[in-house]
């Protein structure tokens, strides 16, 4: 957002008779590692989508229900002033003298409007499909968003527009302008169709205006002549007569004047010029909430009434998406509980993270690493930052933003705030002690022997450790239970399958469920060059189940297709491709375990394993829910946890195999569909995502899943395969080699599938299906192509 400002940086320790509620959770992020600074955001009024704009001109659109970004494209704005998102897919971008309206689904510009003067204020009415901008020299222009045309242009002949608000009836608009020298000006209520002045308020310096839901009141913020006092005032929505004043503060105190806001349920939600978000009670008076969370108040830059709102309702949930600081962390405010209940971080690349006030998290691996809880008041001497990934095992929650929106007041109040100081004080801290008995300066060491030993020291809170885990080249290689001691020794086997450097990190789990910060180190292995790797390829496809009502349409064809294309495109990478083809009635637990056990005994560190499964996938229904893939002889998917335990293959089973198999390049691809008629398919899908994501991170392996979509025969008729596997086969066949270097890496493949499957499913089924890819391991090639 661009604003005209006068600099007024003042610090004061102002006390108040009654302090408002404050945001108790503190988040930070590694700004030097972000791709681009966020410069704008908006949410559709129905709460289904949110859009974010970045300094590098990228715009991304987030699907709240799906819990992921579904669109990213580049625009032409240079200095974004405001943005709005409509329910019918229009994105409105405002800067300088330009308004651009884009259909974000097609990325096409629908129209552009050019104003005479620079835009200083804008406002949007979803109810009436109207948009308006105020400009320098008092000009106002109103647009019909349905017809994409100008309705009227008129001028308040005084100065720059400083406040602008549509009346809920869509026929009138309130306009205020900045004072010229000492001359104050009234707010005018103007008829949009004619431009006629209907009524004026008393004179003042107005920086914000917002009608309540019925148009009975107009809430405004104003400054006095000497710019030393800011007030919130309630005007009659028809006569603009002053009804009452809500709040008055000296400008260098806790809260200076709002320059943007909206009224909801008797509250004014305002973004202030002190770069805070405040909630004012317009009935009882006073400030109910502020994001200013400490006694030292830094006012920052005082706006002269030029700026725009960054608070958007998320449908009828009572939650609002806000951004007062102008950085990459957005907040979710709940008006019913009067609290920040969540946070949303995003970057212009693929990264995003969602955080709830009770410590639940969701997001991409890089975002969960870059965003952290922090506290300047902790007693700890080190490890001040606790990245979100530290709570992945205990707190990962797919589609978290949707959950936060759906949680009612009772549920929200029952949630406990994540108490940063208490948690950070008890997190263990680790340090690399030695490699083969010698100290490793700066976290680096060299070794010629393949079998080596490392020691990890716990430097703080050793009694809190429940286990210490060691990862090699991002794959889990060993877990040692916590014993209260301060030193843990690991026997390791070095490899040059990724080159001479072996990358390690260790982390300690704690009693609080939060992991320590990773201690990272490298060992340069100068031993004997290893033999060319082998590929162990396990493909499982089950069309015919023992219970015929679970039969599928094309699981066998999908498994056959995957086996053929990987064998064809991967041969030159490997000394040998060792296939395990398990189909239909042969696909029982004993046979699948036998194949994986055989690989466990033979695979070396430099080898690769790919496991592909096409069949049913379910969550158990007991208290300890677990994800299962369903072999041929399971005859009841739901309500028989004993049968699943006896004949199914659980996430825990897969985790054990992934950990025990030496191969450090592991890929698991699951096209595990839901059975038709599963009433709680959405909940089951989220639970499966959580189980697989935690499995992927805990083992450091790659997982690509279809997220439990139901199979349809029409997919096979048109594609010859299911949608997910069709995209997979296209990708491995060469379509996913986006940089055209004739080598396909696993990250390139997963990105292609995540983008292609929604496109295909919307074309064939009318609704988008979103696969999930969890890539916590190192990237590596899976196929090569001849020129």
Predicted regions and their residues:
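Cysteine endopeptidase catalytic domains of the caspase/legumain-like
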Residues: 371-787
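Repeated scaffold domains used in trafficking and secretory/extracellular systems
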Residues: 38-40, 79-83, 118-123, 159-164, ...
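Beta-strand-rich domains and repeat architectures in extracellular enzymes and scaffolds
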Residues: 30-57
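Hydrophobic beta-strand positions that form the internal "hydrophobic ladder"
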Residues: 50, 91-92, 131, 173, ...
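Short glycine/acidic-enriched loop and turn motifs that connect beta-strands
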Residues: 57-58, 138, 179-183, 224-228, ...
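Eukaryotic protein-protein interaction scaffolds centered on beta-propeller repeats
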Residues: 18-40, 249-253, 290, 327-433
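Residue-level detector of Asp-centered blade-edge/turn motifs that repeat once per structural unit
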Residues: 45-46, 87-88, 126-127, 168-169, ...
């Amino acid at each position: 957002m661009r604003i005209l400002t006068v600099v007024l940086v003042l610090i004061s320790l102002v006390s108040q008779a009654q302090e408002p509620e404050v945001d108790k959770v503190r988040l930070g992020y590694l700004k030097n590692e972000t791709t681009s600074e966020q410069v704008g955001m908006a949410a559709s009024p129905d709460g289904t989508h949110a859009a974010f704009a970045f300094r590098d001109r990228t715009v991304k659109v987030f699907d709240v229900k799906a819990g992921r970004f579904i669109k990213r494209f580049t625009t032409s704005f240079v200095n974004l002033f405001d943005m709005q998102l409509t329910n019918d897919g229009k994105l409105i971008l405002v800067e300088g003298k330009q308004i651009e309206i884009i259909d974000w689904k097609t990325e096409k510009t629908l129209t552009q409007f050019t104003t005479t003067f620079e835009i200083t204020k804008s406002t949007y009415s979803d109810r009436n499909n109207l948009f308006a901008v105020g400009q320098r020299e008092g000009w106002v222009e109103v647009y019909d968003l349905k017809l994409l045309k100008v309705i009227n242009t008129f001028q308040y002949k005084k100065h720059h527009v400083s406040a602008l608000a549509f009346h809920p009836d869509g026929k009138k608009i309130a306009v205020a302008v900045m004072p010229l020298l000492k001359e104050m000006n009234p707010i005018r209520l103007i008829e949009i169709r004619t431009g006629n002045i209907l009524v004026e308020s008393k004179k003042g310096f107005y920086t914000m205006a917002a009608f309540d839901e019925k148009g009975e009141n107009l809430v405004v913020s104003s400054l006095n002549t000497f710019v030393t006092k800011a007030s919130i005032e309630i005007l009659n929505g028809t006569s603009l007569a002053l009804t009452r004043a809500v709040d008055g503060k000296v400008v260098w105190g806790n809260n200076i004047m709002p320059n943007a806001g909206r009224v909801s349920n008797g509250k004014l939600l305002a973004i202030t010029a002190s770069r805070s978000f405040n909630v004012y009670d317009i009935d009882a008076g006073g400030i109910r909430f502020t994001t200013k969370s400490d006694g030292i108040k830094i006012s920052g830059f005082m706006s002269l009434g030029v700026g725009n709102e960054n608070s958007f309702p998320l449908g009828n949930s009572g939650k609002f998406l806000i951004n007062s600081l102008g950085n990459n962390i957005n907040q979710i405010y709940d008006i019913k509980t009067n609290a920040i209940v969540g946070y949303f971080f995003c970057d212009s690349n693929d990264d995003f993270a969602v955080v709830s006030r009770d410590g639940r998290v969701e997001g991409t691996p890089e975002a969960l690493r870059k965003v952290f809880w922090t506290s300047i008041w902790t007693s700890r001497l080190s490890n001040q930052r606790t990245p979100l990934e530290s709570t992945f095992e205990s707190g990962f929650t797919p589609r978290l933003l949707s959950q936060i929106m759906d949680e009612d007041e009772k549920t929200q109040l029952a949630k406990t705030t994540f108490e940063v100081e208490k948690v950070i004080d008890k997190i263990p801290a680790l340090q690399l002690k030695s490699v083969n008995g010698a100290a490793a300066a700066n976290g680096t060491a060299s070794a010629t022997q393949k079998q080596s030993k490392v020691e990890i020291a716990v430097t703080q809170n050793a009694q809190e450790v429940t286990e210490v885990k060691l990862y090699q080249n991002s794959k889990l290689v060993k877990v040692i239970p916590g014993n209260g001691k301060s030193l843990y020794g690991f026997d390791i086997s070095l490899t040059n399958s990724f080159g001479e450097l072996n990358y390690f990190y260790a982390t300690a789990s704690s009693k609080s469920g939060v992991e320590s910060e990773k201690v990272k180190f490298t060992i340069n292995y100068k031993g004997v060059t290893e033999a060319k790797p082998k590929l162990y390829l396990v493909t499982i496809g089950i069309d015919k189940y023992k219970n015929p009502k679970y039969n599928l349409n094309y699981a066998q064809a999908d498994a056959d297709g995957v086996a053929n294309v990987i064998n064809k495109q991967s041969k030159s990478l490997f000394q040998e491709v060792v296939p395990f083809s398990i189909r239909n009635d042969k696909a029982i637990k004993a046979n699948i375990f036998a194949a994986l056990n055989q690989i466990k005994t033979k695979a070396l560190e430099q080898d690769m394993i790919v496991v592909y499964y096409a069949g049913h996938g379910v969550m158990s229904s007991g208290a300890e829910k677990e994800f299962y893939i369903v072999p041929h002889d399971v005859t009841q998917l739901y309500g028989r946890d004993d049968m699943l335990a006896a004949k199914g293959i659980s996430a825990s089973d897969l985790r054990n195999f992934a950990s025990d198999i030496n191969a450090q390049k592991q890929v698991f691809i699951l096209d595990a569909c839901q059975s038709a008629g599963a009433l709680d398919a959405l909940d089951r899908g989220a639970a499966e995502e959580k189980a697989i994501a935690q499995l992927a991170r805990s083992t450091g392996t790659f997982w690509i899943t279809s997220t439990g979509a139901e199979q349809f025969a029409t997919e096979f008729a048109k594609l010859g395969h299911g949608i997910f596997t069709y995209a997979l086969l296209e990708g491995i066949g060469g379509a996913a080699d986006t940089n055209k270097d004739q080598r396909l890496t696993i990250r390139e493949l997963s990105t292609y599938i995540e983008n292609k499957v929604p496109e295909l499913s919307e074309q064939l089924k009318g609704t988008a299906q979103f696969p999930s890819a969890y890539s916590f391991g190192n990237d590596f090639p899976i196929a090569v192509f001849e020129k």
